[in-house]
Amino acid sequence: IAWLVEERGVRPGEITAVTFTNQAAAEMRQRLEERLGRRAASRMTIGTFHAICLALLGDVGLIGQGEALSLAEETLRVLGRKGSARALLQGVSRVKNGASLETAGLEEEIWQAYCARLEERGMLDFDDLLIRALALDTGGRTCFRHLLVDEFQDINETQYRLVRAWSASGSLFVIGDPDQSIYGFRGADGKCFQRLRAERPELREIRLVENYRSTPEVLEAAAPVIEKNPGGCRRLRPNRPSGPAVRMVRSPDAFSEGVFLAKEIGRMTGGVDMLEAQALGHERTVRAFSDIAVLCRTHRQLELVEKCLRHDDIPCVVSGREDFLEDRQVRGVLAFFRSLQSPADPAALETALGLLWDCPADLAGRARRLWTQGADLAALEEAVRGYGHLELWLDRVKEWEPAVEKEKPWKLVEGWEERYGTSPALEKLRNTAVFYPAFRSLW
């Protein structure tokens, strides 16, 4: 991007950069501000596929993850089906990104019922953003002058088609590593590089051979495996100095593996004396717990490893575990505050009414119609009189509506806990909310 601006004289406003996470987009923008200045960086479009599609589509009703989960639960309940609502949402996402119903493990009746309920509420989910943006571009109206795509190996079919449409009459730059394509379960395919090469024979390919991440020992161990992938020989030069050898340990079962990891971490952090360390033939370098990471392929393996670590009093933090966000009370609280901030979001209101006040569907529908029509408090009070569930809800609305735009998210959660009681999940929500300036960032 800097080369386009500094060497080629491209105007910043003609540049669009696509990343895969909001964090990556923020880091990219910050680095460009430091190099090119805030004014130049502010004119560029930098964001995820979903963020850019949302900007193109304008003001649309976007369903939150909590509301989508409630909608999936409702779909299964109405159809009398058992199963995981989260698995249903994962299947829906795969279908919307190009997979067949069979491949996604989704019955057509369930698929149709979920989509119908989403449409009834006038809402879109995150995958719909990409599909709608692609439909919007049917006439080639959305084309960026200079499009740059990060982590190209992670894109799925819909995203590939967006890239092709957005760069139809402009320049395209993609960067990625097909050997790091690990999101096949979400529809990603590392062969997208071969596909792009076939569609654009004029493209210029630049191979980055200097590796800044791994020691020579790691590269030497990985090379024989990676070279079996399509694409020929990889000649990577390590930039880092030599380190310890890569060790491979075979365990008879998962439990033995967990026990070994716990003992090994104990040894590395000073859990055995010097004589034992010398007998094992390992260097005596005491590590901090924060120096060590354990990667597992499945959540089930992770739970067993965590159990073994805690048994040996080894402190650990499990990254990526967000079970508390699936808690009914947490989802209800988030949906309630979302409904106050976004009155036009009917799914948020129905989710809050169902989870926090066990409100029947017919009463929730009544409240939704009144709320989305913008009825004032006096009209709402008159309309809900005699309906206990809705009277409780309206009391909470009158109590919290003045504060929702003024208070920080963690203060709102703390206030909720003080008034109505807390739970471990709500405590985690409050601790997480400290890192967010506004509730909208938590959706």
Predicted features along the sequence, with ranges:
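Conserved motor-region signature of P-loop NTPase helicases/translocases
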Residues: I1-Q30, L148, Q153, E157-V174, ...
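Amphipathic, well-packed alpha-helical segments that form the structural scaffold of globular domains
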Residues: A2, L54, E73, S93, ...
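A basic/glycine-biased coupling hinge at the interface between accessory DNA-binding modules
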Residues: L4-C143, G170, A245, G365
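Phosphate/oxyanion-binding loops and surfaces in catalytic or ligand/nucleic-acid-binding neighborhoods
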Residues: R35, I52, D59, V78-K82, ...
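Generic alpha-helical segment signature
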Residues: Q65, T103-E108, F126, R186-D189, ...
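An amphipathic alpha-helix signature
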Residues: Q65-E73, A262, E350, W410-V413
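Proline-centered turn/helix-capping motifs that create local helix->coil transitions or kinks
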Residues: S100-E102, V225-R235, E405-P409
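Conserved helicase C-terminal RecA-like lobe
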Residues: A288, L302-R310, D327, L334-W443
